[in-house]
């Protein structure tokens, strides 16, 4: 399953999302969701402890001027790689 988080982590229940995540899933942080990947964010450790791979959409990180502040443990991906994730996963859940 591909989970997309497009809202600020302060506006969604990330713990509810993480209860659904299984090994082999991917979590894509996009739009305001990229704030969850800030290296000093209380959410980044919680996300990285999940069994899913966590990535952030590079264009959204850049658009918010956060490139230098994103955790080095979070990979950034292009739109092409985002499309590849949608092909990889038959199901997607937006948060």
From Swiss-Prot:
Pfam families: DsrH (PF04077). Its main location: cytoplasm. It is found in: Cytoplasm. GO terms for cellular component: sulfurtransferase complex. InterPro entries: DsrEFH-like (IPR027396), Sulphur_relay_TusB (IPR023526), Sulphur_relay_TusB/DsrH (IPR007215). Gene3D superfamilies: DsrEFH-like. It comes from the Bacteria. One of its GO terms (biological process) is tRNA wobble position uridine thiolation. Keywords: Cytoplasm, tRNA processing. Part of a sulfur-relay system required for 2-thiolation of 5-methylaminomethyl-2-thiouridine (mnm(5)s(2)U) at tRNA wobble positions. HAMAP family: Thiourid_synth_B (MF_01564). Belongs to the DsrH/TusB family. PANTHER family: PROTEIN TUSB. Heterohexamer, formed by a dimer of trimers. The hexameric TusBCD complex contains 2 copies each of TusB, TusC and TusD. The TusBCD complex interacts with TusE. This is Protein TusB.
